[in-house]
Amino acid sequence: MAKRDYYQVLGVAKNASDDEIKKAYRKLAMKHHPDRNPGNKDAEEHFKEAKEAYEMLSDSQKRAAYDQYGHAGVDPNMAGAGAQGFGGFADAFGDIFGDIFGQAAAGGRGGRSGPQVYRGADLRYSMEITLEQAAHGYDTQIRVPSWVSCEICHGSGAKPGTKPETCPTCNGSGAVRMSQGFFSIQQTCPKCHGTGTYIPEPCTHCHGAGKTKETKTLEVKIPAGIDDGMRIRSAGNGEPGINGGPSGDLYVEIHIKAHAVFERDGDDLHCQMPIPFTKAALGGEIEVPTLAGRATFTVPEGTQSGKTFRLRGKGIKGLRSSIAGDLYVHVQVETPVKLTDAQRDLLQQFEKSLVEGGARHSPQSKSWFDRVKSFFD
């Protein structure tokens, strides 16, 4: 099945800003999140589709590649794409893709002999946290796959008792020259991939890679106020460099789980608050939840369903904010159910008193009936 256009998935224009893309993704994620739609396969697919679209369009490099080449520009099976989930940009045998990914440590060889030095690939790790953890900060540990020097060949990639030999194609320079008419182009040696050597008898344990994978534990400090989609950089914990090049970095991408009570909008929080119709009619103090505990505020007499109250400073203090956002409480007036006969009689007496009183006890209803009457007159 062909993939839909990422902009179409999020419902934004191709020139949409980063904020517009983020807001569109947050809205779809809230709507289709599996926690809110248990057992709903369609919602799960929509959630995955929106997540994939956001991951591509929120990254400036991936977005540029997608804008120019479409899905082919970000297909993980083609030479321009990053990894899905957790993974590097080079495979287990240390294939080098050079400047396509910006991994050359010095921007090329500059005409010098000897093997090229490459920076290790960056890795990505996706982590889900709760809204409370995002608001207050969170220290945790993660276990990630990591490359280490092969214990059998000690990193040489060669079978014990043998050693790498000088590449016969480039004579150890790591590069070859290709002539095309009047032009001479230097490019990475196709046999040794720029290392200047080749391995006639690869190590059977690491298959000539000189490294093997193991799992290591890393400490991750999630700062208070982090938002969905933000990344935390762990320097030097990506894949090891090639030929002595520096290691890449590990990027921990944060995703915030849907909350049972609150919805986040930047530094602000929103919640739906049901109140009994008697409290709405008479007014009084109500108790509402916040991320810091419980808070109280007074609803005025005659509060209507849908009324929004703002509690200043009861939201989240963002990473770049000096003060916390606000909590918006959206009141929903509840109608009582399963009435007893005595309660029903009381309500009927109450309704009768409203009609006989002649006062405008229901201003919205009165206004609506007036408009309907004028429509038919």
From Swiss-Prot:
Its cofactor is Zn(2+). SMART domains: DnaJ. CXXCXGXG motif repeats lie at residues 150-157, 167-174, 189-196, 203-210. GO terms for biological process: chaperone cofactor-dependent protein refolding; DNA replication; protein refolding; response to heat. The keyword Cytoplasm applies. One of its GO terms (cellular component) is cytoplasm. Residues 5-70 form the J domain. Belongs to the DnaJ family. This is Chaperone protein DnaJ. The gene is dnaJ.
